[in-house]
Amino acid sequence: MKANLLVLLCALAAADADTICIGYHANNSTDTVDTVLEKNVTVTHSVNLLEDSHNGKLCRLKGIAPLQLGKCNIAGWLLGNPECDPLLPVRSWSYIVETPNSENGICYPGDFIDYEELREQLSSVSSFERFEIFPKESSWPNHNTNGVTAACSHEGKSSFYRNLLWLTEKEGSYPKLKNSYVNKKGKEVLVLWGIHHPPNSKEQQNLYQNENAYVSVVTSNYNRRFTPEIAERPKVRDQAGRMNYYWTLLKPGDTIIFEANGNLIAPMYAFALSRGFGSGIITSNASMHECNTKCQTPLGAINSSLPYQNIHPVTIGECPKYVRSAKLRMVTGLRNIPSIQSRGLFGAIAGFIEGGWTGMIDGWYGYHHQNEQGSGYAADQKSTQNAINGITNKVNTVIEKMNIQFTAVGKEFNKLEKRMENLNKKVDDGFLDIWTYNAELLVLLENERTLDFHDSNVKNLYEKVKSQLKNNAKEIGNGCFEFYHKCDNECMESVRNGTYDYPKYSEESKLNREKVDGVKLESMGIYQILAIYSTVASSLVLLVSLGAISFWMCSNGSLQCRICI
C-alpha cells in the first residue's frame, strides 16, 4: 500500500510539472516537392519555378504589334506577290507570324535560292525601309518594264511581283544593260532579283532577242554569272518556264552592279534593314488579340517571371528557358507533418519531434509551454527571420542565375539539307536534355539542403534550451523538457530569449530532483522485498504440495517408500 501511494504521488508530481517544448510550424498546405532522396515530400511553403500556362493568343510584344503574314509567306511578302499587297505598307514589327499552310509565296514557279538563310537573317530584323533601288521609269529606258504573267494574276488580270521588274525586249531589241547602286543608307540593304529560264528557244528569242544571254551580279563580296537553262519542264501554275530568285545583303558603302543581255528579273525595290534582338519568326495558327506580353510562343503568350517553361521550345522576347520537366518546385518552408492528436500535442523534425504545430502561426520555429498559468505558443523570431532571409536570398539567386530570358527561334533547312536538319535536331535535343537535367538536379539539391537546414535550426534551438536548463530540467522526449522547479510565464520567457537564470532555480531543482530520486529508490526497495517474499512463499507452497502428493501415493500403494538405516 505504501509503495502504491508513493508511485501515485510521483505520477501526480510529474503531471503537474511545468514543461517547455521546441517545435516547428505546420499548416494545411498540400504542396509537395522532390529531393535527391525523396519524392513528393509535403512542405509548408514552396515556390514554383516552371511556367506551364499560356493565353492561347498572339499579343503585342512590349507594345509593338507583330507582322501577320496571313495567307502569304516570307517569299511572297519580300518579292511582292500581288496577293500580298496589304503587307506593302508595313515598316516595323515585333515579330513575324506565318501560318502553317500559307498559300501565297512565289507565284511564278521556280526556286528561291538560300531561302532558309534569308529567313534566318530576317529573324533578327525588326524594321526596314522599302525604297526604289532602280526606279521603273528611268532605270531601264531601252527595255520594256511591263512584263506580266498569268501565274501572278491579281483581280483576274495578269500581273507581276511588286518589288521586281520583268525586263523584256523593246521594239524588237534587247540591248546590253548595265546599272549599279551605291549603298548610302548607313545600314545593310537587302537586294532581290531573279533569272528567267524559258521552256524553249522560241520563247527565249521572243522575250530577249538573244539565245546566248547572261546575267552578271557583282558586289565587293558577291560575284555570280548566270546563264539561262532553256528546257521543257512540266507545267506548274500553267507555266513551263521557271524563275530562280536570288538575294544578297549590301553593306554600307558597297556597290552592286547588274549587267545582262537578257533573262534578268531586275530589282525595283530594296530594303534597308534595322536589326533588333527581340525579333523572330514563328509559325502559328493563333489569332491576334488586344493584349501585351514580354514573351510569345506559337501556342500563345506567356506572362511569367519564372525561369523555366514547358510550353514550347520556340519563343520570342524575354522568355523562360524551355525544359521538358513536368514539375520544378523549390521548397521554402519546412516538412509539413502536423502533429497527430492521438499521440499528444507534441510530437519529429530532425528525428526527435513527431509533428509540427498548426497553432504556431507567427514563425517557423518556436516553443510551447505549460505551467500553472496556462499554456501557449511562441515563435522564435530571430531564428525564423534568419532562415527566411537565407532561403529567400537563395531562391532569388537561383532564379536570377537561371532566368536568362531570350528568344529561341526554330532553324530553317531546305529539302536538300535533311541530314543537317536531323543532326541539328539531335544536337538541340541533347542540349535540351542537359538543360532539363541541370534544372531538375539543381532543384533536387536545393530542396535537400533547405530541409536539412530547417532540421539543423530546430536542433540548434533545442540545444540552446538544453544548455540553459542543464540539470534544472530533464529531457522527456519529443523535443520537450520537464522542469524540476516552478517556471511561471516570466521564467518561460527567459528560457525563450536566452536569459534563463540557472543559479536562481538550481536549489529548488536540486531538492525536487532529490525527492523524485528518493521516491524512485524507496519504491525500488519495497518492490525488492515484495519480490523476495513472493518467491519464498511460492517455494513453500510448492514443497507442501509435493509432500502431500507423495504421502497420498504412499498410502494407496502407488508409491513405495523404503527407509533404510
Curated annotation (Swiss-Prot):
Disulfide bonds: 21-480, 59-291, 72-84, 107-152, 295-319, 487-491
Transmembrane regions: 529-549
Classification via InterPro entries: Capsid_hemagglutn, Hemagglutn_HA1_a/b_dom_sf, Hemagglutn_influenz_A, Hemagglutn_influenz_A/B
Gene Ontology molecular function: host cell surface receptor binding
Post-translational modification: Palmitoylated. In natural infection, inactive HA is matured into HA1 and HA2 outside the cell by one or more trypsin-like, arginine-specific endoprotease secreted by the bronchial epithelial cells. One identified protease that may be involved in this process is secreted in lungs by club cells.
Residues on Cytoplasmic side: 550-565
Subcellular location: Virion membrane; Host apical cell membrane
Side of membrane Extracellular, spans: 18-528
Glycosylation sites: 27-28, 40, 285, 303, 497
Lipidation (S-palmitoyl cysteine): 554, 561, 564
UniProt entry tagged with the keyword Ribonucleoprotein: no
GO biological processes: clathrin-dependent endocytosis of virus by host cell; fusion of virus membrane with host endosome membrane; fusion of virus membrane with host plasma membrane; viral budding from plasma membrane; virion attachment to host cell
Site (Cleavage): 343-344
Membrane topology listed for this record: Single-pass type I membrane protein
A cellular component annotation (GO) from this entry: extracellular region
A Pfam family hit: Hemagglutinin
Key words of the record: Clathrin- and caveolin-independent endocytosis of virus by host, Clathrin-mediated endocytosis of virus by host, Disulfide bond, Fusion of virus membrane with host endosomal membrane, Fusion of virus membrane with host membrane, Glycoprotein, Hemagglutinin, Host cell membrane, Host membrane, Host-virus interaction, Lipoprotein, Membrane, Palmitate, Signal, Transmembrane, Transmembrane helix, Viral attachment to host cell, Viral envelope protein, Viral penetration into host cytoplasm, Virion, Virus endocytosis by host, Virus entry into host cell
Keyword Manganese: no
Function: Binds to sialic acid-containing receptors on the cell surface, bringing about the attachment of the virus particle to the cell. This attachment induces virion internalization either through clathrin-dependent endocytosis or through clathrin- and caveolin-independent pathway. Plays a major role in the determination of host range restriction and virulence. Class I viral fusion protein. Responsible for penetration of the virus into the cell cytoplasm by mediating the fusion of the membrane of the endocytosed virus particle with the endosomal membrane.
Assembly information from the UniProt record: Homotrimer of disulfide-linked HA1-HA2. Interacts with human CACNA1C.
Remaining remarks: Major glycoprotein, comprises over 80% of the envelope proteins present in virus particle. The extent of infection into host organism is determined by HA. Influenza viruses bud from the apical surface of polarized epithelial cells (e.g. bronchial epithelial cells) into lumen of lungs and are therefore usually pneumotropic. The reason is that HA is cleaved by tryptase clara which is restricted to lungs. However, HAs of H5 and H7 pantropic avian viruses subtypes can be cleaved by furin and subtilisin-type enzymes, allowing the virus to grow in other organs than lungs.
Family to which the UniProt record says this protein belongs: Belongs to the influenza viruses hemagglutinin family.
The protein's name in its UniProt record: Hemagglutinin
